[in-house]
C-alpha cells in the first residue's frame, strides 16, 4: 500500500470524523474544519492524515508544550488512529514517525502518547516503536 502523510485539510473532515468515531470519539464532521482552524491559530499543534489511493486511512495530532519543569519543549500525540481496514500495514508507524520529525524540528527532547487502559494492542504498538510506560494520568471533567 502506497501511503502519503500530509497536513490535514478541511476537505478531510468526513474521513477524520469517521476515524475519530472508530477510536471511540463520535465527531460531527462539520466540527472538524472549525477545530483545525482553531489549532492552526493557536499554533504548536499539527494534524496530519495518511492517504492511500485518494482515501484518508489514518490521522494523528501532535502538540508541543513548554513547562516550568524543563528547558526543552516536549511533544504529545493527542490522537492517532488508522482505519480498521488499513491496520498492520505500517501506516500507524508512518504517522508516529511524522510526529517525531515535527517534534525534533521544533526542539522537543521527548514525545509522549496517552492511550486508554483497554487499548492493549495500541500499547504493544507503542512499545515496538520504542516508547516506555512512564506514569499514570488523572483527569477531572469540568
Please report, for each region that a protein language model flagged, where it lies by residue.
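Conserved acetyl-CoA-binding loop-helix of GNAT-fold acetyltransferases
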Residues: 82, 88-101, 128
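Conserved GNAT acetyl-CoA-binding A-motif
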Residues: 96, 103-115
Amino acid at each position: 500500500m502506497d501511503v502519503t502523510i500530509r497536513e490535514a485539510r478541511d476537505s478531510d473532515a468526513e474521513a477524520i470524523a469517521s476515524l475519530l468515531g472508530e477510536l471511540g470519539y463520535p465527531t460531527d464532521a462539520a466540527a472538524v474544519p472549525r477545530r483545525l482552524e482553531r489549532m492552526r491559530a493557536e499554533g504548536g499543534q499539527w494534524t496530519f492524515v495518511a492517504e492511500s489511493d485518494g482515501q484518508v486511512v489514518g490521522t494523528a495530532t501532535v502538540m508541543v508544550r513548554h513547562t516550568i519543569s524543563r528547558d526543552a519543549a516536549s511533544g504529545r500525540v493527542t490522537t492517532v488512529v488508522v482505519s480498521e481496514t488499513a491496520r498492520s500495514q505500517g501506516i500507524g508507524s508512518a504517522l508516529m514517525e511524522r510526529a517525531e520529525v515535527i517534534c525534533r524540528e521544533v526542539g522537543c527532547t521527548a514525545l509522549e502518547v496517552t492511550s486508554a487502559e483497554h487499548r492493549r494492542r495500541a500499547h504493544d504498538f507503542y512499545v515496538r516503536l520504542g516508547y516506555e510506560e512512564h506514569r499514570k494520568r488523572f483527569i477531572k471533567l469540568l
